[in-house]
């Protein structure tokens, strides 16, 4: 059986990864990166970009922000705003002049919204890039698997890397709850991957 991922190498964060990225991008300024990341409340939203930007040359990386908003203002909007402020600061500091956003409203029909998001991502012009980095740190599992599948299925002949920022001290406090224990929120679609409440945060994946 042929595995599509057999030629991929998985590296965890150690000095080897930092050295690899520095050597690979600093010595190959002709390489052009499109960096996809999710827009959300998760404090890890900008960790990956903050990690990558010092290792590439100015103008070597563009960004595509994936947003999956609700039509109503969420109670965690302040956290999203803080993340966006930091993201814009990174754009300015590292001269990321080309950055765009793909946005689909997930507050109504989840399956329809997911298909629409896949279509928008598939139509994005990846032609000028040699490397595609997908940062799934702030993207719900129910969404990022489809994004990865969509881009991989385009058979672009590009290097595609998947990055995730993990925080063990944060993740250890996440406990699985049976759906019967969840309190419904009027107007909130249970299948969507965003948080439904703060303190504690309930996330449907």
Features from the language model and the residues they span:
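Long, low-complexity, Lys/Arg-enriched
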Residues: 1-131, 142-205
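Residue(s) in the substrate-gating loop at a strand-loop-helix junction
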Residues: 134
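Aromatic- and glycine-enriched pocket-lining scaffold segments that form the walls
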Residues: 137-139
């Amino acid at each position: 059986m042929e595995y599509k991922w057999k030629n991929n190498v998985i590296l965890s964060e150690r000095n080897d990864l930092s050295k690899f990225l520095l050597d690979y991008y600093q010595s190959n300024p002709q390489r052009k990166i499109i960096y996809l990341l999710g827009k959300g409340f998760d404090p890890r939203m900008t960790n990956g970009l903050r990690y990558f930007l010092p290792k590439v040359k100015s103008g070597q990386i563009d960004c595509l922000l994936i947003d999956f908003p609700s039509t109503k203002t969420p109670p965690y909007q302040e956290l999203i705003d803080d993340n966006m402020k930091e993201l814009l600061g990174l754009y300015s500091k590292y001269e990321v002049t080309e950055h765009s956003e793909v946005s689909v409203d997930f507050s109504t029909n989840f399956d329809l919204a997911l298909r629409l998001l896949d279509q928008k991502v598939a139509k994005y012009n990846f032609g000028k890039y040699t490397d595609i980095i997908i940062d799934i740190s702030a993207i719900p599992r129910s969404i990022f698997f489809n994004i990865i599948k969509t881009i991989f299925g385009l058979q672009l002949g590009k290097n595609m890397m998947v990055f995730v920022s993990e925080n063990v001290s944060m993740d250890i406090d996440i406990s699985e709850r049976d759906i019967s224990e969840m309190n419904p929120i009027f107007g909130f679609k249970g299948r969507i991957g965003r948080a439904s409440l703060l303190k504690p945060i309930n996330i449907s994946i």
